[in-house]
Amino acid sequence: RYCLLSRGLGDVYKRQPENASIVLGISHSAWLTLDLPKPLPQELVEFEEIRGPKHTAVSTPGDLHFHIRATQPSVAYDMASAITAALRDIAEVLDEVHGFRYWDGRSIIGFVDGTENPQTPAAREYFGIIGDSDPMYRGGSYQFVQKYIHDMTAWNALPVSEQEKVIGRSKHDDIEMSEDEKPANSHSAIANIGDDFKVIRDNMPFGTVGNNELGTYFICYASTFSTVQKMLKNMFLGVDGANYDRLLDFSTAVTGTLFFVPTVDMLGDFAG
C-alpha cells in the first residue's frame, strides 16, 4: 500500500509540479504494529512529555504523519485526497492542520520564523539527515511535530518593545539582540542550543480569525532526536538561571509526537 500511495502521489506531482512535496513520518508504535525492520532507527521512541514548572510539552498519539506542501492549495488538496482514499479503510484522521505562508515567512505573532535554520545544502543535510551513525537508516530523518495555540489577545496587548524581549529579536527587521540586552528567558536565548546542535524548522501558521484560534504548527527535521529533546528541555524546564522560555506564556503546546521519515527506497523495501 505504501508503494501504491507513493506512485499515486508521484502522478499528482507530475501533473501539477507546483513546488509540491510530501513527507511521510512513522511513529514508534506504528513501526511495531506494522512489524517494520529491526532494529528500529536508533532514536525512534515514544515521545515522553516534558513537564516544567509552569508549562508542559505534551505527548499525544499518532501512527503516521503526512507533511504536505505546495504553492497551489489545489495541489495540496489533491495530495491529501489521494492519501485519504488510500488509507480510509485502515486509518482514521486524528488531526488535520492547514497552514499558510504569512507575509515574508513570519509566524502569526509577527516575527520572522526559522531564522536559525542551517542555510547551506551541506549544513541542512548534516543537521537534517541521518548519516553514518545509523547506517541501516542512512538518508532518513527524525520528524518532531507540535501544535501550539497562541493567546493572541495577551500577545497583542504587549507593546512591540516587550514582544521583542520575549523573542530576543527585533520585530520589523529580524535582528538578534546583543547578549547584554537579550533576556535570559527569551525564546532565541533558550531555543538556540548552539551552532553544533541545529534542526531544520518548517513551521507554519494556521488558524481561524472568527473564533480567535490561531497558532503555529511546529515541524522540525533532525539527524538526531536528542538535539530536539535538548531544545525542548531548555524551553520547558529552563537553563542557565532562566526558568523557562517566556514565549510559552503565550503559546500552549496541545500535541507532541515523534516520527521517523524513511527514504522512498526504504518504503519500497518495507513493502517487500
Predicted regions and their residues:
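Extended, compositionally biased non-globular segments
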Residues: 173-243
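Long, hydrophobic/aromatic-enriched structural stretches that serve as scaffold segments
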Residues: 23-82
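TerminUS-proximal long segments
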Residues: 233-272
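Glycine-rich, often proline-containing surface loops adjacent to acidic residues and nearby aromatics
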Residues: 58-69, 139-144, 200, 212-217
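Long, hydrophobic, well-ordered secondary-structure blocks that form the structural core
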Residues: 67-116
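Single conserved hydrophobic/aromatic residue that forms the stacking wall/gate
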Residues: 2-13
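A common structural junction motif
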Residues: 11-15, 84-94, 236-245
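Aromatic/basic-lined ligand-recognition segments
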Residues: 101-204
